[in-house]
Amino acid sequence: LHVAIETSYIHGRKKRSMAQESALVFPKNFYNNFYELTKAMASMETDQHMVVDGLRVVQLLPAIVIGDSRTGNNRGDTKVVNAPVNAFGRAKEALDALRSTPFGESKAAAIASVAMVFPADRSAELNLITVDRVVEGILASLTRPEAIGERVHLATDNRIRTEDIIKVEKEELGVNVRLTDPTLFRNVTLPLITTILKKANEPRLASALEKLGTIFGGYGEWGQPIHSVGNDVRVLGLPLRRPNTLYAFRMLCRHNKLVQEFGKVKDPDEIARRERVWAAALARIEKESGRQAASLEAEEFRRRIGEVLDLKSFEPK
């Protein structure tokens, strides 16, 4: 048995039609990037080997994979959704530090006016799937003979809009971001912004925004596919209730801010220690509140995490 791990974004951009699990048609509006294109080519080649050579294969197509649904653990600056979270988190920290310097308030306001922009179309929807759901799908595919020959979207039926991302980031990170046209941002605004920031002696912030444009830019544009789902439940036998995307993104913001400090904590041993402390703190909060940590409003979560965790030393209280 061969398990092919692809991406649900092999369907490319679509204006109206839904991306079906059973069909793979070269899109009229092309792809967000060459990663998606090469994955689509690989899927077509897999289909060919299945038909011609009798390859026993299950094709699993995860959407945009993010962290664990409970803890938000989503390491790495090069991940699609980490890009806006870490970029704006670092931007806010840099601007807060700048405000404490002479004439810093006016300088910070000027930088914020050009830096705190989010390259996304209001109509764009992202299909995020938690890593634990993907792992469940992979393990299930190994014990389901009926999955052979099937293409399975490991995706969600509750997508997140760019407006939701901005709202959650404001609540969790305290950043005020405005939407801007992604194509204009990538080709005109971003080069201008990075030049201004470098001249203003903010090279790290410029680098973070460059990563945002490079990694996330395409996924904020029009025509993002709406994925059909069903084979994950019907064929693989996964639970019908798929992860709550908004909850997962909220926990990702909290994790990136508190556990990894927007990517500044890089030592693997220290990260592993913090992950253990974080998981235990969440378990304590959930036991005391009787609710999922992800369901708590931002202000209540900040209060509760401060009661169980020393955020400076990152040790339990």
Task: Report the location of each language-model feature.
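NAD(P)-dependent short-chain dehydrogenase/reductase
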Residues: M50-E125, V131-E136
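Substrate-binding strand-loop-helix patch
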Residues: A120-E136, R151-E172, T183-P191
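Flexible loop/turn segments at secondary-structure boundaries
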Residues: S8-K14, I66-T71, V135, N158-E163, ...
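Amphipathic terminal alpha-helices
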Residues: G223-K317
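Conserved Rossmann-fold NAD(P)-dependent oxidoreductase catalytic core, especially the SDR/UDP-sugar
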Residues: L1-L37, V51-V52, V57-V58, S69-T71
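Hydrophobic "lid"/C-terminal helical patch
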Residues: F88, I138-L142, E169, M251-N256
